[in-house]
A protein has these predicted regions:
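Register position in tetratricopeptide repeats
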Residues: 242, 276-277
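Alpha/propeptide regions of enzymes that mature by internal proteolysis
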Residues: 17-183, 190, 212-245, 254, ...
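Conserved alpha-helical positions within TPR/SEL1-like repeat arrays
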Residues: 268-269
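Structural marker of alpha-solenoid helical repeat scaffolds
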Residues: 259, 292-293
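Bacterial Sec-dependent signal peptides at the C-terminal "C-region" and cleavage site
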Residues: 3, 7-23
Length: 293
């Protein structure tokens, strides 16, 4: 109770003494680099509406940034611009902080395409607040229930096996399991970009998922990741179908249905494909199952 009251008073003081162009996105997040794929990503959860529209920034083949606490959004695009010019995250962050009168209220992390990392937690970020840098990642949090949140995130990211989405999701789950944001939970986001830019923006984004307002944002984010994987396989199936590789297409359509079994449209297109090549014996049972739902 005392800690909650202290937090409320602290927030009131900070909001009355900060510029109107900042937003109090107090939260926990991770920026990370996958050295096996080159992918770069940011994942975040907050008790603030649409955290994904403010905190995470990433550019294929360049880097990723998380800007939070009393958010100054410019750290995102300016950080990416600096990394695109070849500057190290530490240099960029130092320069940006030097020009920011509100630096003590900021929490920022940056990682580049080589895994170089830099992070900052301002002295006036509300407790519990801190960050931890490890190989190819940084985790950071403020207004947390416990000071164990970001160490738990680091351990989860390091120990989890899987792709970048799996590992960053594990970090978010670990934060919530330690108590998470003292104020509760509201929104979450995951942004992942490719390691090698194609010059085609929509191809360079591997994953861009947002839960803007939800009572259990991490649970919903995991559901969206699962659906995203389903449609990745469905898209691969369509690609194989265009190439006339029917067997490969059917394998991908099957995988899509496994990830998203509650959606009848995915097996429907499997049946359409089979019917299109004249294999009605296999197509009809799938059609029946789809239309019985």
């Amino acid at each position: 109770m005392v800690r909650n009251l202290s937090m409320i008073l602290s927030l009131g003081f900070l909001f009355s003494n900060t510029p109107s162009n900042t937003r109090p996105v107090n939260t926990y997040s991770i920026v990370a680099y996958d050295d096996s794929t080159g992918q770069l990503g940011v994942a975040v959860q907050s008790h603030w509406f649409s955290v994904g529209s403010l905190v995470p920034w990433a550019k294929a083949g360049v880097g990723a940034v998380a800007t939070q606490s009393l958010v100054k959004v410019e750290y995102g695009p300016d950080g990416l611009k600096g990394m695109d010019e070849g500057k190290l995250p530490h240099t960029i962050l130092s320069e940006l902080l030097a020009d920011d009168n509100g630096r003590d209220l900021r929490q920022v992390a940056m990682i580049d395409r080589h895994g170089n990392v830099s992070a900052h937690t301002g002295e006036k970020c509300i407790d519990y607040a801190g960050h931890q840098i490890g190989k190819n990642y940084s985790v950071q949090a403020n207004i947390m229930e416990k000071p164990t949140v970001w160490p738990a995130m680091a351990m989860a990211f390091e120990k989890t096996r899987g792709d970048l989405a799996d590992r960053m999701m594990a970090a978010l789950d670990a934060a919530e399991n330690e108590g998470g944001d003292l104020r509760g939970k509201q929104s979450a986001s995951m942004l992942i970009v490719s390691g090698k830019p194609t010059g085609i923006p929509w191809k360079d984004v591997v994953m861009d998922l947002r839960v803007d307002d939800h009572p259990t944002p991490l649970k919903e984010l995991k559901r969206l990741i699962r659906i995203h994987r389903a449609y990745q396989h469905a898209n691969k199936g369509d690609h194989y179908l265009e190439l006339g590789k029917i067997d490969e297409a059917m394998i991908e359509y099957g995988r899509a249905s496994q990830f998203y079994p509650e959606n009848p449209e995915l097996p429907y297109w499997s049946a359409v494909t089979l019917a299109g090549i004249g294999d009605l014996q296999k197509a009809l049972p799938i059609f029946r199952e789809v239309f019985d739902k």
